[in-house]
Amino acid sequence: MTPATGAPTLRGAAVGRGIGIGLMYGLFKPRVLGAWRVPASGPVILAVNHSHNIDGPMLMGTAPRPVHFLIKKEAFVGPLDPFLRGIGQLKVDRTTVDRTAITHALGVLGDGGVLGIFPEGTRGEGDFASLRAGLAYFAVRSGAPIVPVAVLGSTERRGRLISALPPLRSRVDVVFGEAFDAGDGSGRRTRKALDEATVRVQGRLTGHLEQARRLTGRTE
């Protein structure tokens, strides 16, 4: 992050990507499909299903570009606070309209970076069944395309050594989908327009998840 503003930096996210690669490929066996669908340059939003704590680190280690994730403020405790900030991650208060987080997230996209979002707002079934409007807002406001991402296999079994993690060296599938625009081309940013965009986005995300399950043979 930049000392003056606290904004995340690409350099920090690049360090985070290196750590993610080392950890995820060292502990598990990620199988990455469709990573070429992530634009090689320019702003993009990765919309990731979220059913396990490793989903964020897994994306940091498997995405083809450094990612700045919006992460709940509760994760920024003790030494994790400066660490997460240092690797370019964004702290967000989910209980209110966090204008600092919004500004930093739009700044990432404005600088042509990659913003990672868990559109359900919290960890759950990971099925995109309940989306918050934040994803559509960032996409419509910035004009950045959305790339849906399905992380599958992280909750199928529990590890013997660490029950909170999948078994060591187990396969986790990460499937990137086709990029798409959230807006309808009208340029509207009204609440109604965002609600309509959220419905469209949800349809694309659930469709990608179903396709990813068929492709990988996963049922979770």
Which positions does each model-derived feature cover?
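Non-catalytic C-terminal accessory region of glycerolipid acyltransferases
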Residues: 2-12, 100-220
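A short beta-turn/loop motif at secondary-structure boundaries
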Residues: 36-39, 167
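Catalytic core of membrane glycerolipid acyltransferases/transacylases, capturing the structured
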Residues: 16-18, 25-26, 38-96, 104
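A secondary-structure boundary/capping signal
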Residues: 34, 71-72, 88, 118-119, ...
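Residues at the C-termini of beta-strands that transition into short coil/loop
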Residues: 36, 73, 93, 150, ...
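A conditional alpha-helix N-cap/helix-loop micro-motif detector
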Residues: 28, 95-99, 128
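Short gly/ser/thr-rich secondary-structure transition/capping motifs
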Residues: 25-33, 155-159
